[in-house]
């Protein structure tokens, strides 16, 4: 009987030892810098269900939409449940101007240190070069305040910031006036919709790219029920040019987004899978570190 128990124990130990290398490889495998913008999942059930979709897609980072309509404690508990971290949060400009301390406190509680201006209401959109310069100065002031609190500020574009003012876009004027503290979150699909080259635009903001919104545009006349957007790699954007340009510009995060997805879970899975494959191929230097 003793010999049988010894043999069983030895066999179990050998099986465990054999499994350890594979487990260690999986545990040690670094997560690529891929996140999901939670706006994509706004119609995909409860917040718990939305985060489960992110987790099941193999993604471990999100960009939140404000407070996600829950307390900081509740949000942190849900993030921890799915081993997901918040890497940034979209916060309306009015909140940053009028409730900065409250915004900072909430985001500290969930472990996030990057706040992003997501959109400008019509009344806040400059109409000339001087207006974009003034807005940049205002955002630079807020960015410096946040830097003193251990946080950073970024700005997310649509297409209206890319109007031309005597050879420079509104976005370029804004960043020139803001100073180095302000980072950009470049939405690649909106850059393309403005008639500009996303790869070239990445080069203009090299060193100031907190993130890109990784999204795609469907061919003209297609996916009209989805706002004309497509899952990453399934549309018309030239990712073979974009991803090397993003790597050269030192993009920190690739945030999967789709404004009007018919199937949010599928869009996220498709986008994450595409980036996992192609980031490895386009960023050999990063992969070797």
Where in the sequence are the language-model features?
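Bacterial N-terminal signal peptides that target proteins for export
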Residues: 2-11
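Bacterial N-terminal signal peptides
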Residues: 10-21
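N-terminal pre-domain/capping segments
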Residues: 23-114, 207, 281-289
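Conserved, mostly hydrophobic/aromatic
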Residues: 36, 54, 62, 79, ...
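A cross-domain feature marking catalytic cores of carbohydrate-active enzymes
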Residues: 36-40, 64-66, 88-93, 117-119, ...
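Acidic-and-aromatic substrate-binding clefts and catalytic sites of carbohydrate-active enzymes
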Residues: 41-46, 61-74, 92-100, 123-126, ...
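Active-site acidic/histidine proton-transfer and metal-coordination neighborhood
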Residues: 93-183, 265
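Acidic/histidine-rich catalytic cores of soluble enzymes
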Residues: 148-236
